[in-house]
């Protein structure tokens, strides 16, 4: 129990007892799908570039695809039907072929949106120059074990220091300016258990913290200036912690395959709130935080997109993926990735990807 801020805790408890209020009008704007009847193309990662105008996606297709958000929304405006259906080949501005299936993407800070990093199923971290459309950096230090997550820190101006989490049970911290054989640090959150590191994220506000989600059912927060031991252990999930995201410098959101999200205080490690409603028992379904609106988006194994407001434990908005194409007959489809556009205050954009390769763009605005 947090005795330092009793008034704040009382406010949180009162909000938990309130009924969730629907303060946002969210609607489906654009659906991007392929006319090909080829095998499933799971979208495992979605990222906006620093301008918030380019969307990159990746997954098992061995391609990083790039879309212009304004053109996707423009298609919707032209159609006049409420929802615009666009073929992937037309909507995709360009793509880069990769040597392996990808699990994660992240734009490298300080590159002007020119360099994007990726983690793949073969245990390799690569960076690509988008102007040349060629790889410019490669690290193979996870022993061939799948890399689940990559991220970069903005702390202290060291914008090129990155980290990767892998099935090998480690978080590797590295600097792309240094030779591949050199490492800033190696962290084993679960110790000798070597449980998979499923997610890593640095504090996007520039603080010295890096959060880690592990298959040992715990989350961890480290100070990058002292990586020997975690500054905080987040214990409360009953299954794998698949995602961890900073809401701000003082709170972290985790997702677990126990079917819930949890909001934590970085100050003392207590659970502020638990969020339930979506279905997640096995797969990676995505987690994204819109910091300006304090909204969390995640996918679900019932093929729906869920949005939670930090103030309430039940979803404030739910929408199902529309069946598209020849793959729509499968009852095993699920929403596999989500990403909020960070710009805006009273308007928002959420992009979600499915296990069938379908990309859906949602737009919303705050109700008067």
UniProtKB/Swiss-Prot annotation:
PROSITE patterns: WD_REPEATS_2, WD_REPEATS_REGION. WD repeats lie at residues 38-77, 97-138, 141-184, 192-232, 236-276, 279-318, 330-368. Pfam families: WD40 (PF00400). Functions in association with RUP1 as repressor of UV-B-induced photomorphogenesis mediated by UVR8 and HY5. Plays a crucial negative feedback regulatory role downstream of UVR8-COP1 to inhibit UVR8 function, balance UV-B-specific responses and ensure normal plant growth. Is involved in the regulation of photoperiodic flowering and vegetative development. May act as negative regulator of photoperiodic flowering by suppressing flowering through the action of CONSTANS (CO) and FLOWERING LOCUS T (FT). Disruption phenotype: Small stunted leaves and early flowering under short days conditions. Induction: Circadian-regulation. Expression increases during the dark phase with a peak at the beginning of the light phase and then decreases to reach the lowest expression at the end of the light phase. Induced by UV-B. It comes from Arabidopsis thaliana. Keywords: Cytoplasm, Flowering, Nucleus, Repeat, WD repeat. It comes from the Eukaryota. This is WD repeat-containing protein RUP2. Interacts with UVR8. GO terms for cellular component: Cul4-RING E3 ubiquitin ligase complex; cytosol; nucleus. The gene is RUP2. It is found in: Nucleus; Cytoplasm, Cytosol. One of its GO terms (biological process) is flower development. SMART domains: WD40.
């Amino acid at each position: 129990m947090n005795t330092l801020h009793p008034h704040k805790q009382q406010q949180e408890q009162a909000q938990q007892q309130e009924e969730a209020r629907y303060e946002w009008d969210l609607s489906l704007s654009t659906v991007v799908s392929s006319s090909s009847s080829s095998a499933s193309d799971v979208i495992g990662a979605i990222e906006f570039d620093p301008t918030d105008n380019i969307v990159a996606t990746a997954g098992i297709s061995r391609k990083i695809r790039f879309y212009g958000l304004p053109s996707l929304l423009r298609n919707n405006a032209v159609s006049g039907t409420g929802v615009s259906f666009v073929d992937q080949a037309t909507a995709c501005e360009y793509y880069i072929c990769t040597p392996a299936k990808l699990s994660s993407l992240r734009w490298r800070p300080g590159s002007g949106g020119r360099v994007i990093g990726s983690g793949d199923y073969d245990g390799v971290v690569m960076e690509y120059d988008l102007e040349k459309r060629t790889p410019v950096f490669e690290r193979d230090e996870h022993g061939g074990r799948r890399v689940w997550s990559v991220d970069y820190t903005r702390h202290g101006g060291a914008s090129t220091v990155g980290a990767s989490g892998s099935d090998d049970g480690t978080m590797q911290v590295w600097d792309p300016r240094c030779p591949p054989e050199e490492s800033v640090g190696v962290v084993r959150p679960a110790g000798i258990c070597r449980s998979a590191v499923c997610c890593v994220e640095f504090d996007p506000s520039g603080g010295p913290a890096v959060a880690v989600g592990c298959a040992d059912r715990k989350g961890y927060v480290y100070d990058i200036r002292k990586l020997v031991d975690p500054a905080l252990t987040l214990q409360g999930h009953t299954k794998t912690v698949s995602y961890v995201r900073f809401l701000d410098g003082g709170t972290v959101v985790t997702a677990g395959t126990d079917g819930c999200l949890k909001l934590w205080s970085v100050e003392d490690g207590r659970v502020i709130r638990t969020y339930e409603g979506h279905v997640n028992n096995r797969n990676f379904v995505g987690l994204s935080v819109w910091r300006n609106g304090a909204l969390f988006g995640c996918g679900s194994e019932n093929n729906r997109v869920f949005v939670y407001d930090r103030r309430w434990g039940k979803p404030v908005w739910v929408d199902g993926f529309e069946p598209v194409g020849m793959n729509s007959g499968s009852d095993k489809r699920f929403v596999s990735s989500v990403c909020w556009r960070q710009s805006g205050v009273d308007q928002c954009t959420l992009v979600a990807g499915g296990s069938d390769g379908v990309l859906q763009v949602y737009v919303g605005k705050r109700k008067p």
